[in-house]
Each structure stands twice: as structure tokens, then as C-alpha cells.
């Protein structure tokens, strides 16, 4: 608590002069603080090495429940935040397609998900990750379906209608959230010492609204690389002995 910067952000209806005066007498009156040193190792974000054979973990729960994960490395950094936002749209389309694939080809009531993570405080460490809870017998089918969705997104641009259905909920969420102070607090956190966050906020809505099918296909080609994928299976202790045991 004695090191590092203190950032105070005020939002809402208040008297600016009174607020500045209060800050000068409180936080502004504190003694200078030493910089918080961060080691190079702490800032070095590593994605796991690719695994053609899934890493295996086991659980002691129900014998008919397993989980499967496949992830691809992306990037990071506030300067590349526009790409990170485009990847969120790509992930939404991937999620919908994976869900439909299970429903159409297996009539299964699984709810697979897909996440796009783009760390703004690090220049690397981001990922696209698809995952689902399935029956142990369907683990390999999950990986096959995920590979098929990735390959299709690489080969063909998405339709304008599919893109609209993927991005519209995000745009509406931004419009709703922007009416509250918490939205601005979360978006501008750290902007005092990283002005790029002001820039990133200024293009938030535009980044989602301007994404095109061609952009998403380019991203799919860049990141859905089979040789870079990392896979994980969490299986019951009895069963699925064909994957690497990493307990």
C-alpha cells in the first residue's frame, strides 16, 4: 500500500472546484510515493505450448461428465485493442456455430462457449478459447466440431446477417452501460498514466460497428492455426485414458 500510483476518478454530478480542493487536501497532501517495480518475469505472459494430444486432468465427480477445452494464442496491449474487440465478435460467431453444430449433428443439449481474452496491460497473453461440458464419449467430437468451425471461418467470410446477429447485442450492451458511471470508471481505469485508454474509449463503439466479414476472415486465418492450438480434457478418474495425464 505504500508504493505505486493512486488514481482517483470522479463521475457524476459534482462541483469540480470543490472536488479538486478536497483532493488537494487529502490525496494531494500525501508524501511522494515510491514507484511500484514490476519484474520482467511478472510481465512476461506465456501461452502454453501447443499440444496435439490434449493435456488431461481428472475429477472425482459424476462419471458421465467431462470438460473439453481448445485455445489458440492471440495478442495483447492497449494499442491493439481494436483487434481484441474484433476477436470478441469472431468468438461470438464461433460460439453460435459450435452450438448449432452440436444441436444439428448430435441433437445434444450441450452449451459450448467461446471466449476472447485480450489483456490491455500486457503485450501478449491473449487467447481465443472454446470449451464445453460434455459426456466423456463426446470429448473427441467436441474437438472435431471446434476444428470444423475454425476451418470454415478460415475458408469463407461470414454473411452480413450472421455478423449483424453477433455484433448487435454488444452494441446494445454498450449503449445501455454508457448511461451509468460504472461504465466510465471501468473503461478509463488507468488512463491517468496511460493516455491510450482515452483513445481506446473514444473508438469503442466504432470498433464493433465497423467490423466486416473480411476482417473476421483475416483474423480467423491469423489465429486459428492448428499447430498452435492447446487442448485440455477434464475427465472422470475412470475413463479417457488416451490423453496425456497432467495431474
Residue spans of the language-model regions?
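M16 family metallopeptidases and their MPP-like homologs
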Residues: 3-11, 64-77, 81, 103-210, ...
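An aromatic/glycine/proline-enriched structural segment found at the starts
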Residues: 7-66, 73-75, 235-247
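Generic structural signal for individual residues within well-ordered alpha-helical segments
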Residues: 20-21, 140, 164, 217-218
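Generic, well-ordered alpha-helical scaffold segments in large soluble proteins
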Residues: 22-30, 73, 93-97, 101, ...
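Active/ligand-binding-proximal structured segments within catalytic/core domains
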Residues: 70, 80-95
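Mature hydrolase/peptidase catalytic cores and their serpin-fold inhibitory cores, especially
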Residues: 112, 215-218
Amino acid at each position: 500500500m505504500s508504493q505505486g500510483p493512486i488514481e482517483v476518478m470522479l463521475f457524476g454530478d459534482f462541483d469540480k472546484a470543490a472536488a479538486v480542493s478536497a483532493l488537494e487536501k487529502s490525496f494531494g497532501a500525501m508524501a511522494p510515493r515510491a514507484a511500484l517495480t514490476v519484474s520482467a518475469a511478472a510481465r512476461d505472459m506465456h501461452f502454453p505450448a501447443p499440444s496435439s494430444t490434449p493435456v488431461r486432468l481428472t475429477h472425482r465427480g459424476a462419471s458421465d461428465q467431462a470438460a473439453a477445452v481448445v485455445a489458440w494464442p492471440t495478442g495483447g496491449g492497449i494499442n491493439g485493442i481494436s483487434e481484441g474487440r474484433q476477436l470478441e465478435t469472431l468468438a461470438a460467431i464461433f460460439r453460435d456455430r459450435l452450438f448449432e453444430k452440436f444441436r444439428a449433428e448430435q441433437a445434444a443439449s450441450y452449451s459450448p462457449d467461446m471466449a476472447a481474452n485480450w489483456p490491455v496491460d500486457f503485450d501478449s497473453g491473449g487467447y481465443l478459447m472454446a470449451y464445453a461440458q460434455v459426456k466423456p464419449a463426446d470429448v473427441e467430437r467436441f474437438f472435431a466440431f471446434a476444428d470444423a468451425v475454425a476451418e470454415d471461418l478460415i475458408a469463407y467470410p461470414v454473411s452480413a446477417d450472421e455478423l449483424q446477429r453477433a455484433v448487435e447485442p454488444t452494441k446494445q450492451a454498450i449503449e445501455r452501460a454508457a448511461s451509468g458511471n460504472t461504465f466510465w470508471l471501468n473503461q478509463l481505469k488507468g488512463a491517468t498514466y496511460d493516455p491510450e485508454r482515452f483513445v481506446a474509449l473514444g473508438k469503442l463503439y466504432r470498433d464493433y460497428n465497423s467490423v466486416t466479414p473480411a476482417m473476421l476472415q483475416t483474423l480467423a486465418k491469423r489465429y486459428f492455426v492448428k499447430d498452435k492450438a492447446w487442448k485440455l480434457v477434464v475427465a472422470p478418474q475412470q475413463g479417457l485414458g488416451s490423453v496425456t495425464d497432467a495431474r
